[in-house]
């Protein structure tokens, strides 16, 4: 069975890659704490939306990761750590809102409910929000780095290719004549051919 997706970690972020075979990843929230090579991934997360999405995507694409240590200082207002705990415990509603999150903008837009469910099943979160002592963090990482079995399913690559809808519209009238062939809608700042009308 394949344990790690190709090109893992899938999404870029503020993290360091350690041992991809490790059972633990470390999220230091808004704190910058020196990384240990024994963790699969080690990095910060300051937002309750994109930050949480990146953690989920990079976790479920490596079946070796079974634990996530959440430590460091919480980001003010965004509450990324609280939101990570909430999505793991409660998931997301039909609008993509993290159920139970008190973060400022706790909406997940780029991953599916299936990806969230896989995250909930694959990992155990170790809530040590506020812990910044590197020695204590090292003890936890070393305790969990080899603990447990690989998740019994292949890695799940969960990146949506959401396409943004274009906001460009052709004006229905031009208020500035540029030439016989072109007019401009000064309110929209759009130049069009006269054939478009």
UniProtKB/Swiss-Prot annotation:
Gene Ontology MF terms in the entry: methyltransferase activity
Keyword Methyltransferase: yes
Catalytic class of the enzyme: transferase
Enzyme Commission designation: 2.1.1.-
Keyword rRNA-binding included in the entry's annotation: no
UniProt keyword terms in alphabetical order: Methyltransferase, Transferase
Top-rank lineage group of the source organism: Archaea
GO BP annotation list: methylation
Description of how the protein assembles with itself and partners: May be part of a complex composed of 3 subunits; MtxA, MtxH and MtxX.
Family that this chain belongs to: Belongs to the MtrA family.
Protein name: Putative methyltransferase Mtx subunit A
């Amino acid at each position: 069975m394949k344990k790690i997706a190709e090109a893992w970690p899938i999404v870029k972020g503020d993290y360091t890659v350690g041992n991809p075979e490790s059972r633990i990843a470390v999220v230091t929230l808004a704190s910058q704490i020196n990384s240990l090579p024994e963790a699969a991934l080690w990095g910060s997360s300051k937002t309750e939306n994109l930050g949480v999405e990146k953690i989920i995507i990079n976790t479920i694409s490596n079946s070796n990761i079974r634990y996530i240590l959440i430590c460091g200082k919480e980001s003010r207002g965004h509450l990324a750590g609280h939101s990570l705990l909430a999505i793991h415990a409660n998931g997301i509603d039909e609008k993509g809102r993290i159920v139970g999150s008190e973060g400022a903008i706790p909406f997940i837009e780029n991953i599916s409910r299936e990806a969230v469910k896989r995250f909930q099943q694959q990992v155990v979160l170790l809530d040590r929000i506020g812990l910044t002592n590197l020695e204590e963090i090292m003890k936890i990482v070393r305790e969990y780095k080899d603990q447990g079995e690989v998740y019994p399913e292949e890695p799940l690559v969960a990146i949506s290719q959401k396409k943004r809808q274009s906001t460009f519209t052709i004006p229905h009238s031009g208020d500035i004549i540029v030439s016989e062939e072109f007019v401009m809608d000064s309110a929209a700042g759009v130049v069009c051919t006269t054939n478009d009308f």
